[in-house]
Amino acid sequence: MTPPGRLYLPRVRGTRLLFLLLGLLLALPPRAKGLPGVGLLPSAARAAQQHPQKHFAHGTLKPAAHLVGDPSMQNSLRWRANTDRAFLRHGFSLSNNSLLVPTSGLYFVYSQVVFSGEGCSSKAVSTPLYLAHEVQLFSSQYPFHVPLLSAQKSVCPGPQGPWVRSVYQGAVFLLTRGDQLSTHTDGISHLLFSPSSVFFGAFAL
């Protein structure tokens, strides 16, 4: 006999207990089980499962840009976005060879250039060749271009024969809508133009 005020629980062991718990779990609604469709009406849940990219796209469309150097411009580094390897997405635009930041926030900014040459001078005392690449910021907060990323290399004097130097830079910055990102390069005549060698871009985090 069960004492007054106490709930009688039958003893269930082993396999019977497992099936009992499984039955209780299956009887719960999707919201309680943490299954796909949590927090959504049945019709919305079905739509999300059938078209996940369309349903969640609004939260993933972040500004992004990837530019490549124009090989037809041998005396200057001009960026272009009209190739199949380059793009401007969700607000980014290219104006006067500068990327225009569409919204304020954190951005990863990156750039790479590759320099090459046939060899150093055969003179006993040759003049060093300095190479540099810089990503600059022009903002309404500053009346001049501010370096964000900067790297330098030098070649010659050195071993005879062809040489190649690559420079890659990337970091996270807090940018403001309307900021302009551009580059400055020393040693443009030695740039090795190809979409995989000379590029510049940024994307929102």
From Swiss-Prot:
SMART domains for this protein: TNF
Q: Main location per UniProt? A: secreted
**Gene Ontology cellular-component annotations:** extracellular space; membrane
**GO biological process terms held by the UniProt record:** immune response; positive regulation of canonical NF-kappaB signal transduction; positive regulation of extrinsic apoptotic signaling pathway
Which Gene3D superfamilies has this protein been placed in?
A: 2.60.120.40
Question: From the UniProt record, which GO molecular function terms apply?
Answer: cytokine activity; tumor necrosis factor receptor binding
Start and end residues of each THD domain = 63-205
- Cell compartments where the protein resides: Secreted; Membrane
- The entry annotates sugar attachment on 96
Q: List the disulfide bonds.
A: 120-156
Q: Which UniProt keywords apply?
A: Cytokine, Disulfide bond, Glycoprotein, Membrane, Secreted, Signal
Cited SUPFAM superfamilies: TNF-like (SSF49842)
The positions making up the signal sequence are 1-34
Cited PROSITE patterns? THD_1 (PS00251), THD_2 (PS50049)
Which family is this protein grouped under? Answer: Belongs to the tumor necrosis factor family.
General function of this protein: Cytokine that in its homotrimeric form binds to TNFRSF1A/TNFR1, TNFRSF1B/TNFBR and TNFRSF14/HVEM. In its heterotrimeric form with LTB binds to TNFRSF3/LTBR. Lymphotoxin is produced by lymphocytes and is cytotoxic for a wide range of tumor cells in vitro and in vivo.
On subunit structure and binding partners, the annotation says: Homotrimer, and heterotrimer of either two LTB and one LTA subunits or (less prevalent) two LTA and one LTB subunits. Interacts with TNFRSF14.
Annotated protein name in UniProt: Lymphotoxin-alpha
Native organism is Marmota monax
